[in-house]
Curated annotation (Swiss-Prot):
Belongs to the LptD family. GO terms for cellular component: cell outer membrane; transporter complex. The gene is lptD. InterPro entries: LipoPS_assembly_LptD, LptD, LptD_C, OstA-like_N. It comes from Vibrio vulnificus (strain YJ016). Component of the lipopolysaccharide transport and assembly complex. Interacts with LptE and LptA. This is LPS-assembly protein LptD. GO terms for biological process: Gram-negative-bacterium-type cell outer membrane assembly; lipopolysaccharide transport.
């Protein structure tokens, strides 16, 4: 039998009987050249037009009564972005329906599939697929189904189907259900009687489940994560996300802990129109089995907003059930500082020449000691500033009114009022600045001594104190620049500076210390006007600070090296705060800071304070980090003498912290072994006590759709008898081995990170940091 060519069938027979539906092969070939890649998402492309021409080519064609045509042999049907291939295709002219059978492939730019049968209404663009393997092209998701129907513009119904975010030939996990509804516009999938399978083994069942399948915020369950640790045993976390409105959402998380019970977490977020944004978090663990069956809870409310560009509102209030809450349970509640949970609110107003604020601050103590901080109930600040003679003279006033309150009866409550007017003469050129200022610090205290239980302290303090102290400061700085002679191609700057500071000595022993601490005197601290963080103690000064910085910049003006050094000369040695003034010189310790960046892969930072009277270091820190394509390694060291600690902070029980000062060395590293495997670790050692401080090692495997991590931690948590060192005071460690497992893809709460990035979020006491301060 003679075989007719495909061109003859398409152009002669089909055109005569079904002119609107069949075109010559030449037209088809031109169309094929313009079609995009078949596996490409075309959801943003021009939508298929139901009136677009239908192009069919096949080896054979049979026409029946002008009503339908049967195509067979390598049949290919195209309409706009849609393409169907099959062994046989029947075209029903009246209904404009195509029925394809036998090794059918289907692709409409949103889903591609391989099926035994496809029925497609070419007018309404609805279709059904039988015995199908499918893959969504515009969202994650692939799987199998006995029957798939597209009932809307982007709505799919699957019967006896499955879905996974894993790539082809990877069935690490999948969701199997009797019925699945997928809405690609809403990016949600609804499952009826789903079961979750890992390596084809069912591990979870629910009668009903809704999951997001895209990156936009959609209501539904997020995939669970599994963790096993030697401290709390098996942990299973199941989050549910509720997209209440475009500016409101709520995440509810159920956390099962084998050795503690079931913990419920809630996180509500909002974004208001003109009032800012906020967040309300709550956590509740009834009957903690490892904490005497006590209920444990915590909450935080946080709001930040700018109103009418001038009003600022900030609120951060947190509270937990007990002081061991954060030690026992993993939680990101609150703002914690120095063993205290902050509870504070602030309202501020700013204009062109003045600003004011009202602040209230309280704490929840998380340590078992008597070192309670003061509450601010409240603190009001007012500042005014204006130029008087153009840019040659500025006038400003700083003021505050603070009520200090504390529950500890061994410390006084107080009202503090402070007014600080100042005149500033700022002079500047392109290569130098010179700022001279004079200020008057006037402070009034009303101290409540009746409640004091300490008679010695009561005799030292006065109920009312009025203190007025003048301050004079003159600070000059020069910027010089040249082509570097030592390093060709680099620009070197030299920035010497000098400052004179005078503050007369004033007896202040009758004033209690409410919120003031001694500031660290590093290189940049040499040129401050104050030695303390607040105004309860105004240190006398008659001193000359001097120092210089030199910087090296490459041809792109990227800073590569910075060396700074300086010192204070005390004209009046009595104003020197540290050491015995009779036995020491008029000079402070040398302060040196160094930063180095070599070709963006080798970084160094170091700081030293060298005491010239003792010919010894007081304080030092050093960090060296080498970065390479797939990871980094960092070594660091910190050193502080006990004398420096005693001079800097006021702590009655220093032996609970250190016997000989601080001398600690550490090494931190991370490496992405390949596309899937990564490892990280850190180790810190105390050279004074010759003991381990902290161990952490992590190994993680991460595929395209799941991850598993193994972590070992060993941390020094305290000393026996609460005293550092000694034969009977052994260190106490907390050791934990954990395994965590999670799903990647759609509906995951947090995408799994590599082990290197995990260093930023570990629960270890000493976390990974990059203390490099070059201007890059």
């Amino acid at each position: 039998m003679q075989h007719f060519s495909r061109t003859f069938l398409a152009a002669s027979i089909a055109t005569a009987l079904f002119a609107p539906y069949a075109q010559a092969e030449a037209i088809l070939n031109n169309s094929v050249q313009e079609m995009p890649t078949t596996d490409q998402c075309l959801v943003d492309a021009e939508k298929n037009d139901a009136n677009a021409e239908i192009v069919i080519q096949a080896d054979n064609l049979q026409a029946i009564n002008g009503d339908k045509a049967i195509y067979s042999g390598d049949v290919e049907v195209t309409q706009g972005n849609k393409k169907i291939t099959a062994e046989s295709v029947t075209l029903h002219q009246q209904e404009n329906i195509v029925v394809a059978e036998g090794n059918v492939t289907f692709n409409d730019g949103e889903v591609k599939a391989s099926s035994s049968k496809v029925t497609n209404n070419m007018t309404s663009e609805t279709f059904s697929l039988e015995n199908t393997e499918y893959q969504f092209l515009c969202q994650q998701g692939r799987g199998q189904a006995a029957y798939i129907a597209k009932t809307g513009q982007a709505v799919y119904e699957l019967e006896d189907g499955s879905i996974t975010s894993c790539p082809a030939d990877d069935n690490a996990w999948r969701l199997v259900a009797s019925s699945i509804e997928v809405d690609q516009d809403e990016e949600t999938a609804t499952f009826y009687h789903p079961r979750f399978e890992v390596l084809d083994v069912p591990v979870f069942y629910a009668p009903y489940l809704t999951l997001p399948i895209g990156n936009t915020r959609k209501t539904g369950f997020l995939f669970p994560s599994v963790n096993y640790g030697s401290s709390d045993g098996l942990e299973i976390e199941v989050p549910f996300y509720w997209n209440i409105a475009p500016n409101y959402d709520l995440t509810l998380t159920t956390l099962y802990m084998q050795q503690r019970g079931v913990k419920q977490d809630a996180d509500f977020r909002y974004l208001s129109d003109g009032w800012g944004s906020g967040e309300l978090k709550g956590e509740y663990l009834p009957g903690d089995e490892k904490y005497n069956d006590e209920d444990r809870w915590g909450y935080q409310y946080k709001h930040d907003g700018i109103i009418n560009k001038q009003w600022l509102v900030s609120l951060d209030y947190s509270q937990v059930s007990d002081i061991d809450y954060f030690r026992d349970l993993s939680s990101d509640l609150g703002n914690r500082e120095d063993g205290q949970l902050m509870q504070q609110g602030k309202v501020a107003y700013r204009s062109d020449f003045w600003d004011m604020s009202l602040q209230v601050r309280d704490f929840q103590i998380l340590l078992q000691d008597n070192n309670q901080p003061y509450r601010l109930l409240p603190q009001v600040k007012f500042n005014f500033y204006t130029p008087l003679l153009g840019n040659y003279l500025n006038f400003d006033v700083k003021s505050e009114l603070t009520q200090f309150d504390i529950q500890d009866a061994s410390k006084p409550n107080a009202l503090r009022a402070h007014v600080e007017p100042g005149l500033t003469i700022p002079l500047s050129t392109s290569w130098a600045t010179w700022t001279t200022e004079a200020r008057l610090l006037a402070t009034y205290y009303q101290q409540d001594l009746d409640r004091l239980t300490d008679p010695t302290l009561k005799s030292q303090l006065d109920e009312t104190v009025a203190r007025v102290i003048p301050e004079y400061r003159s600070h000059a700085r020069i910027y010089l620049e040249r082509e570097a002679k030592l390093f060709e191609g680099y620009t070197q700057s030299l920035e010497p500076q000098i400052q004179y500071l005078y503050v007369p000595e004033e007896e202040q022993g009758n004033i209690y210390n409410y919120d003031t601490t001694l500031l660290q005197t590093d290189y940049y601290g040499l040129f401050r006007s104050r030695k303390y963080s607040s105004i309860d103690k105004i240190a006398a000064a008659n001193q000359l600070s001097y120092g210089a910085s030199t910087r090296f910049f490459d041809d792109e003006y990227k800073e590569r090296l910075n060396i700074s050094f300086g010192q204070i000369y005390y004209i009046d040695k009595k104003t020197k705060l540290t050491g015995n003034q009779e036995e020491t010189s008029n000079y402070s310790s040398w302060a040196v800071e160094t930063d180095f960046n070599y070709e963006d892969f080798l970084f160094y930072h170091g700081g030293i304070q060298y005491d010239i009277d003792l010919n010894a270091m007081q304080l030092a820190n050093s960090t060296l980090e080498y970065q390479f394509t797939d990871g980094f390694i960092q070594g660091n060291y910190r050193y502080v003498t006990k004398d420096y600690i005693e001079d800097t902070i006021s702590f009655d029980e220093l032996d609970k912290i250190t016997r000989k000062g601080i001398s600690q060395a550490g090494i931190v590293g991370a490496y992405n072994i390949n596309r899937h495997w990564s490892a990280s670790g850190q180790y810190y050692y105390d050279l004074t006590e010759e003991i381990d401080l902290e161990w952490m090692a992590s190994l993680r495997y991460q595929s395209d759709c799941w991850y598993i991590g193994f972590t070992y931690t060993n941390q020094l948590v305290k000393w026996r008898n609460d005293v550092v060192g000694g034969d009977s005071n052994n260190p106490v460690y907390d050791t934990n081995i954990s395994v965590n497992f999670g799903i990647q893809g759609f509906a995951t709460k947090n995408k799994a990170e590599t082990a290197a990035k995990e260093l930023d979020s570990t629960d270890n006491a000493i976390t990974y940091g990059r203390p490099f301060y070059l201007n890059n």
